[in-house]
Amino acid sequence: MRAWTGSWRWIMLILFAWGTLLFYIGGHLVRDNDHPDHSSRELSKILAKLERLKQQNEDLRRMAESLRIPEGPIDQGTATGRVRVLEEQLVKAKEQIENYKKQARNGLGKDHEILRRRIENGAKELWFFLQSELKKLKHLEGNELQRHADEILLDLGHHERSIMTDLYYLSQTDGAGDWREKEAKDLTELVQRRITYLQNPKDCSKARKLVCNINKGCGYGCQLHHVVYCFMIAYGTQRTLILESQNWRYATGGWETVFRPVSETCTDRSGLSTGHWSGEVNDKNIQVVELPIVDSLHPRPPYLPLAVPEDLADRLLRVHGDPAVWWVSQFVKYLIRPQPWLEKEIEEATKKLGFKHPVIGVHVRRTDKVGTEAAFHPIEEYMVHVEEHFQLLARRMQVDKKRVYLATDDPTLLKEAKTKYSNYEFISDNSISWSAGLHNRYTENSLRGVILDIHFLSQADFLVCTFSSQVCRVAYEIMQTLHPDASANFHSLDDIYYFGGQNAHNQIAVYPHKPRTEEEIPMEPGDIIGVAGNHWDGYSKGINRKLGKTGLYPSYKVREKIETVKYPTYPEAEK
């Protein structure tokens, strides 16, 4: 009996691995074999065509906008100059129209379809492999069972990396990669223009203002997120953010000694009337509103994460895997524009450390978080995911050295990592680790260290950390501003991404689920699930809001519920 008990333990382990892999694959595959009836397939095709037509219509609208006769002088201000510009625009328009005609005629490109079929075949072959190997496990025991289970896990890794590599190339075919680059750039520039307009009113004395004091009693990452929260409320209520940062615990000279001012025209909090936050409607006749920390905010406005602007939601859903993180990252991007001295410091540190790609960022928090907000994680737990991602990177690029940027507040960890993993090149500045200790944390030197750590972590090709750490989440947010979509470029050993003080994080059940154990909860398609966390084993934990039951459910059976809010669109920023 013991042999069979051991066998079934391994069988369950492999099935969990299979379920996790299906979660990754399921979000990308074009076909859904669980819904084979003809009407569902036809509906999917119609919806896909409608989405393509919608995007083409939007592109044509932008094209028509660009074809308007330019106002004011062009070139030398002559009629010839105007004609030349219009001719160039007309040629460009004809090229784009021809591209649309080809798309309508030919559908998806050859490379796209070849890769789609390869992924489909890869998923089938993986299932065939699992069925065969699990049957073999039933007849094994002892060391032979252990050896065979290890081999299965090794082979599963190869299968998973092959499918993920094909999915990456699929995302780049038929100009999709170029489109994603351009669309992400356009969206970023649009939002940054809106923020810049809001933050630089023509007459500061008449501007509606929201005052935010940076000195919340916590560390740098937490304080930065506090300012981001203030900024999002300011943006939503159409108020210029006034950041009070004198006698900042990290730099007594204030925010502006490290980063560029949040406004070039309006830093004075004075106004005809001042009051504490009492809600957007109640404060409409108050010129200057003081905002508390998010923990004390009442009433709560709709502009808190994880909501995204309604006018950008459709575009964000197409271009980014986590629109809520992208939206937060736009405010972080604006806030942390460095002063020249800091820019120079970053450049010098890059050269001194020899920071280059490919590189994976690892952040290990060991001091104040351990035992309270987070569990202790040995370096081995991080390095498992580092090695996995390097093997994946090697499928599509040359990995000359396996580099790891190690950021930690434990000065002894660098030596331990180098000893245990001599085949890796660890990039780290131990002086930053010393300055991150509890006794040195709130100094200008410590601030410099944490800024550098966050910078290099965000620049990495992949991030392994604990999302319970604000530093890790800030690095992940900045990473989103450096790529069209870096939402999947991380592995957290504990929490899923969250923003302190956020509104409820909900998911929607896509497939039904019948509990197999008392720990699991039932689901029907359409049920709203309030997610508490992902266990990173194929299961998440949450509450079925319809039933009021809390427990585990398969992660692949849900999708994110995107919350949208009617943010102001600031059309004046485009003039």
Curated annotation (Swiss-Prot):
The protein's annotated pathway: Protein modification; protein glycosylation
Family: Belongs to the glycosyltransferase 23 family.
Pfam families, per database record: FUT8_N_cat, SH3_9
Positions occupied by motif SH3-binding: 299-305
Taxonomic lineage from the root: Eukaryota, Metazoa, Chordata, Craniata, Vertebrata
Protein modification: Tyrosine phosphorylated by PKDCC/VLK.
Keyword terms: Disulfide bond, Glycosyltransferase, Golgi apparatus, Membrane, Phosphoprotein, SH3 domain, SH3-binding, Signal-anchor, Transferase, Transmembrane, Transmembrane helix
Domain (SH3) ranges: 502-563
Subcellular location: Golgi apparatus, Golgi stack membrane
Entry's Gene Ontology BP terms: cell migration; fibroblast migration; GDP-L-fucose metabolic process; integrin-mediated signaling pathway; N-glycan fucosylation; N-glycan processing; protein N-linked glycosylation via asparagine; receptor metabolic process
Catalytic activity: N(4)-{beta-D-GlcNAc-(1->2)-alpha-D-Man-(1->3)-[beta-D-GlcNAc-(1->2)-alpha-D-Man-(1->6)]-beta-D-Man-(1->4)-beta-D-GlcNAc-(1->4)-beta-D-GlcNAc}-L-asparaginyl-[protein] + GDP-beta-L-fucose = an N(4)-{beta-D-GlcNAc-(1->2)-alpha-D-Man-(1->3)-[beta-D-GlcNAc-(1->2)-alpha-D-Man-(1->6)]-beta-D-Man-(1->4)-beta-D-GlcNAc-(1->4)-[alpha-L-Fuc-(1->6)]-beta-D-GlcNAc}-L-asparaginyl-[protein] + GDP + H(+)
Lumenal topology ranges: 31-575
Gene Ontology CC: one annotated term: Golgi cisterna membrane
Residue intervals on the Cytoplasmic side: 1-9
SUPFAM superfamilies per the UniProt record, alphabetical: SH3-domain
Disulfide bonds: 204-266, 212-230, 218-222, 465-472
Source species: Mus musculus (Mouse)
GO molecular function, one term: SH3 domain binding
Protein name per Swiss-Prot or TrEMBL: Alpha-(1,6)-fucosyltransferase
Transmembrane regions: 10-30
PROSITE patterns from the UniProt entry: GT23, SH3
Membrane-topology annotation of the record: Single-pass type II membrane protein
Function: Catalyzes the addition of fucose in alpha 1-6 linkage to the first GlcNAc residue, next to the peptide chains in N-glycans.
Domain GT23: from-to ranges: 206-493
Enzyme class: transferase
Modified residues (Phosphoserine): 278
